[in-house]
């Protein structure tokens, strides 16, 4: 019996790999997904902070908080992936990162993303984009790119989030900018 368990466990684990890879491919094909790999390659260092929340973990969080905060649980349940990478290093070439961020920003513009924030001040470079459905009732993704001397931050939130969900979240946490969000 022990031998059977020893043989089955690796086989089950190997069998789960295609399922996990298929889930990753679904997220990569989602209109709200942004591939920041070129920027992480340019940084040439490991991120100081790396957050990668995928659907299974997000579903678990949703179930854990549903009884305490229904609005937050509803919001989280619509997310497919949240990725945050923070690089803190004076060795990062801000001009090179900013140039690559401009290329990604141009790509996002061509793909139909809406730029909601653009800052070019001194050596600070910030872009925030929303990927909206055709009727602008659903936000498929949020992309945030920040580069300044010593810090680079990349965020991608992928899901099917209604503007009403964001407004409710803004009310819940007293964030007026989210309550009054108008993406039309």
Task: Identify the role of each PLM range.
Residues 160-184:
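C-terminal partner/receptor-binding element of secreted or periplasmic proteins
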Residues 26-103:
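Early exported N-terminus immediately downstream of N-terminal targeting peptides
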Residues 129, 133-163:
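A short, solvent-exposed beta-edge/loop patch
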Residues 106-133, 179-184:
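Short Gly/Thr-rich strand-loop-strand
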Residues 18-26:
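Sec/Tat signal peptide C-region and signal peptidase I cleavage site
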Residues 9-18:
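Bacterial N-terminal signal peptides
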Residues 44-48, 77-81, 111, 123-125, ...:
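Extracytoplasmic
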Residues 1-9:
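Bacterial N-terminal signal peptides that target proteins for export
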């Amino acid at each position: 019996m022990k031998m059977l368990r020893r043989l089955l466990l690796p086989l089950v684990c190997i069998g789960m790999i295609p399922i996990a890879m298929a889930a990753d491919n679904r997220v990569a094909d989602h209109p709200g997904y942004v591939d920041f790999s070129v920027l992480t390659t340019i940084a040439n260092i490991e991120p100081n902070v790396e957050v990668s929340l995928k659907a299974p973990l997000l579903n678990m969080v949703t179930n854990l908080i549903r009884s305490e905060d229904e609005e937050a649980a509803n919001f989280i349940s619509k997310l497919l992936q949240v990725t945050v990478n923070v690089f803190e290093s004076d060795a990062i070439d801000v001009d090179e990162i900013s140039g690559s961020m401009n290329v990604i920003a141009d790509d996002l513009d061509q793909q139909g993303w809406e730029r909601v924030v653009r800052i070019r001040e001194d050596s600070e470079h910030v872009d925030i984009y929303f990927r909206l459905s055709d009727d602008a009732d659903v936000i498929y993704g949020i992309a945030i790119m920040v580069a300044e001397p010593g810090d680079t931050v990349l965020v991608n939130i992928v899901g099917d989030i209604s503007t009403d969900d964001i407004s409710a979240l803004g009310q819940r946490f007293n964030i007026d900018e989210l309550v009054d969000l108008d993406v039309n």
